[in-house]
């Protein structure tokens, strides 16, 4: 205790007995696949369907594609209440559309790769104030198909390039715009960009390799590659998610029967994850007809909505788990089929009286560990591990002694108590969790190796059943 001699106000630094742990987000997802345009090979986060259109469809009214389920899945995610989503866009050997006009020798290049750029047309017309001797100004219009365009007025030979490349709308579509060295005056003309390609057909390995985009993301939990249903891809998703603490959502192949789904489900296992079935039908703006699409994106949105609105420990199933955006399902599951699929961990997507289309099943892909039987078990477990791991980073480089152990224990217990009082853990504090960080799991040998070991147990359902989590931090030896 400090000794103070004179009257006054004194400030003293005191090391807190515990640190505050912020609960990690578990509602952020990533969808991987082919988009109309956008950055390729690097996942980018978006917060709305409108932002997807801007970044991955060049602002077009119809961002949907005949050869990709990804845009439909993204639409399903946001329609169902998802808030934050990474897009992992992939293409193989794709080319940007480009052209050099014959009249003005203008070279224009599309902003991103893809056949979409072949719909870009550039038109130069004399402005209303054009005068051959005093005002040689033009209006330049850049259009993408018939659905969207922008007109930049009163440009001249000296200003046209900068005007196009700095226009907020035009630069969504055009990345390069330049005049030939010999161009000394502008003239009216229209020309179209060409030779844009979506690249060669993607192989299973391309989708598997695309999972590496997640390596640099630290806030993703939910993972899906919509409509890609080969065993190679699904096995890779399960393995990647198991190894990286993520929650996979798989799709069955289009047209799969209940029996085929049952057989496939029994052939796989994972720490956690979801296998929804069957596919759903939604209105397709491309054809104005119903299109049958995979359910992974829609289900991901329902999960994200439930986590944010009700809590990570609330099952995303039942009459509250309404699936928005589907007009009907590929086929209606019978009660007998549901009673067969639900117990083995298939999330049945079905229509219920007075509720509409809902998720009627909350069991996960873990068929070996009874403590991870439900979707909520896996999501809560992943959330606790990430929250505690991130929240105990303060311990790194600290002296590995009893004082540190006490602080870490108090920090972890405070976080777990918050979960208990929110309803995520059951029972009294003694029944709901425990934290061990002492000389029983931090021996002289482990301390010499620079390790801090923390063991946490918690009871998500039954107070007598504990799920064990062991964390290890690498700490410089003292």
Predicted regions and their residues:
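Structured, hydrophobic secondary-structure cores that serve as assembly/anchoring elements
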Residues: 1-117, 130-137, 143-145, 206-478
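Surface-exposed loop/edge segments in extracytoplasmic proteins
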Residues: 147-151
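Long, low-complexity, polar/charged, intrinsically disordered or flexibly structured peripheral segments
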Residues: 182-202, 207
């Amino acid at each position: 205790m400090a000794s103070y001699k004179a009257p006054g106000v004194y400030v003293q630094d005191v090391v807190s007995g515990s640190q505050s742990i912020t609960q990690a987000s578990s509602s952020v997802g990533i969808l991987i696949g082919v988009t109309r345009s956008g950055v390729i090979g690097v996942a980018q986060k978006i917060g709305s369907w409108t932002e997807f259109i801007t970044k991955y469809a060049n602002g077009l009214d119809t961002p949907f594609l005949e050869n990709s389920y990804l845009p439909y899945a993204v639409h399903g995610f946001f329609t169902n209440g998802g808030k934050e989503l990474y897009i992992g866009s992939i293409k193989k050997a794709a080319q940007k559309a480009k052209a050099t006009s014959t009249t003005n020798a203008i070279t224009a290049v599309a902003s991103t790769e893809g056949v979409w750029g072949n719909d870009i047309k550039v038109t130069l017309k004399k402005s209303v104030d054009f005068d051959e001797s005093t005002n040689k100004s033009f209006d330049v219009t850049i259009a993408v198909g018939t659905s969207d365009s922008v007109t930049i007025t009163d440009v001249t030979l000296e200003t046209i390039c900068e005007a196009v490349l700095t226009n907020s709308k035009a630069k969504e579509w055009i990345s390069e715009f330049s005049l030939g060295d010999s161009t000394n005056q502008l003239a009216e003309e229209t020309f179209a960009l060409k030779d844009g390609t979506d690249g060669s057909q993607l192989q299973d390995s391309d989708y598997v390799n695309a999972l590496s985009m997640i390596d640099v993301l630290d806030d993703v939990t939910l993972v899906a590659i919509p409509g890609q249903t080969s065993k190679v891809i699904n096995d890779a998703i399960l393995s990647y998610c198991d190894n990286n603490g993520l929650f996979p959502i798989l799709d069955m192949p289009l047209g799969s029967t209940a029996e085929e789904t049952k057989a496939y489900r029994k052939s796989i296992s994972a720490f956690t994850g979801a296998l929804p079935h069957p596919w759903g039908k939604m209105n397709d703006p491309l054809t104005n007809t119903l299109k049958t699409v995979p359910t992974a994106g829609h289900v991901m949105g329902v999960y994200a909505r439930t986590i944010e609105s009700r809590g990570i420990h609330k099952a995303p199933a039942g009459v509250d788990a309404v699936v928005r955006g589907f007009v009907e399902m590929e086929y209606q599951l019978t009660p007998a089929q549901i009673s067969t699929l639900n117990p083995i961990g298939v999330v049945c997507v079905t229509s219920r009286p007075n509720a509409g289309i809902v998720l009627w099943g909350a069991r996960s892909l873990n068929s070996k560990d009874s403590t991870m039987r439900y979707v909520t078990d896996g999501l809560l477990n992943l959330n606790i591990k990430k929250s505690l791991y991130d929240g105990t980073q303060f311990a790194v480089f600290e002296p590995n002694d009893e004082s540190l152990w006490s602080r870490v224990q108090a920090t972890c217990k405070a976080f777990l108590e918050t979960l208990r009082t929110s309803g995520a853990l059951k029972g009294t504090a003694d029944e709901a969790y425990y934290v061990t960080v002492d000389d029983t799991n931090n021996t002289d040998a482990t301390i010499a190796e620079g390790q801090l070991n923390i063991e946490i147990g918690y009871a998500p359902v039954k107070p007598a059943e504990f799920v064990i989590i062991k964390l290890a931090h690498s700490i410089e030896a003292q």
